[in-house]
Amino acid sequence: MNDSSEGFGFANQDDIENIIKIMSNGYYKCWDREFFLDLIKNRNSFLYVQRKEKSVIGFIAGKRSEEDCDIIMLIIDIKNRGEGLGSLLLSNTLLVLKDMRVKNIYLEVAVNNSSAISLYEKYGFKKINIRKSYYKFNKTMIDAVLYRMVNS
């Protein structure tokens, strides 16, 4: 893995403002700078970015224990969606987690996010539970689907 100006790599402190901008452009609840700094500094967390022409155009974040990992967000900038970059970001992250010997990978997604659900199922994530009224979008409660993948 690299932290160069192109492709997949570690996020650094200078990337945080772009990450927050990507979140806010996508109408996601934004976490603050300290949250992302903790992901970078904590050895049991990760924050990887996808760069294009030296700019951060997407990111994936998670927390892990010895054998388990929770992917807490994967977001591609709105203007770069549909280019396969989410797939690239996820596949690179799964390779890193495999190298770390992470066995179980969990994530949750809003039940109405069909593009994300298709992506996760394409990579072998299996639906294991539904969390009723988990997300709130524009005063509407949305269920979350909990997924698990066994990384072999």
Identify the meaning behind each predicted range.
Residues 2, 10-79, 90-92, 96, ...:
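Acetyl-CoA-dependent GNAT
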Residues 5:
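Active-site-proximal loop/hinge segments that shape catalytic or ion-binding/gating pockets
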Residues 47, 121-122, 143-145:
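Short low-complexity, flexible loop/linker segments enriched in glycine and/or proline
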Residues 73-75, 106-108, 146:
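Short aromatic/hydrophobic contact patches that present stacked aromatics
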Residues 77-91, 100, 104, 110-118, ...:
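Conserved glycine-rich acetyl-CoA-binding loop
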Residues 110-114, 133-152:
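C-terminal "cap" of GNAT-fold acetyltransferases
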